[in-house]
Regions:
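Positively charged n-region of N-terminal signal peptides that target proteins for export
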Residues: 1-5
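C-terminal motif of bacterial Sec signal peptides marking the signal peptidase cleavage site
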Residues: 15-17
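Bacterial signal peptide processing site
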Residues: 19-21
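Tight coil/turn sites that cap or link beta-strands
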Residues: 24-32, 36-40, 74-75, 83-85
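Structural beta-strand segments of beta-rich domains
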Residues: 41-45
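Asparagine-centered strand-capping/turn motif at beta-strand->loop junctions
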Residues: 47-51, 90-94, 102-104
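Short, surface-exposed beta-strand/strand-loop-strand elements in extracellular ectodomains
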Residues: 52-68
Length: 115
C-alpha cells in the first residue's frame, strides 16, 4: 500500500512540474525578452520586476497585433494572462540591465529569446 501511495505522489509531482516554469531572466540594456513567439495554448505569468527601474510588458499575436501594455515599476509583481498563440514581450528601455522573476503556468511549450 505504501508503495502505491509513493508512486501516486511521484506521478502527481512529475505532472505538476511539467506544467510550470520558474526563471530569473536578465534582459540587457535596451533589449527585449520574448516568451511564446510560437504556436501554443494559453498560459499565465506571475512576473516580478527585480530591477531598480521600470520595464514595459505587452502582448503580441502571431499576426503582429499588439495589446495589453503595462509599465511594471521596480519590485512590483503582476499577473499576465496570455491567449493562445500570443507572445509576452518584456521590454527594457533602460541603459542598465533588467532582471525579472517569471513563474509561468499553463502551456509551457513556449519559445524564448531576445529581440
Amino acid at each position: 500500500m505504501n508503495q502505491k501511495i509513493f508512486i501516486l505522489f511521484t506521478l502527481l509531482v512529475f505532472f505538476s512540474a511539467c506544467r510550470s516554469l520558474h526563471s530569473v531572466t536578465n534582459i540587457g540594456a535596451n533589449d527585449s525578452f520574448v516568451l511564446g513567439n510560437n504556436r501554443h495554448g494559453y498560459f499565465n505569468v506571475k512576473l516580478k520586476n527585480l530591477s531598480a527601474h521600470s520595464i514595459k510588458v505587452y502582448q503580441k499575436t502571431l499576426t503582429d497585433s499588439v495589446h495589453s501594455f503595462s509599465v511594471i515599476k521596480p519590485k512590483e509583481t503582476v499577473h499576465v494572462y496570455a491567449d493562445k498563440n500570443t507572445a509576452l514581450i518584456i521590454e527594457n528601455k533602460s541603459e542598465k540591465q533588467a532582471s525579472v522573476k517569471l513563474d509561468v503556468r499553463g502551456d509551457v511549450n513556449l519559445s524564448m529569446g531576445y529581440k
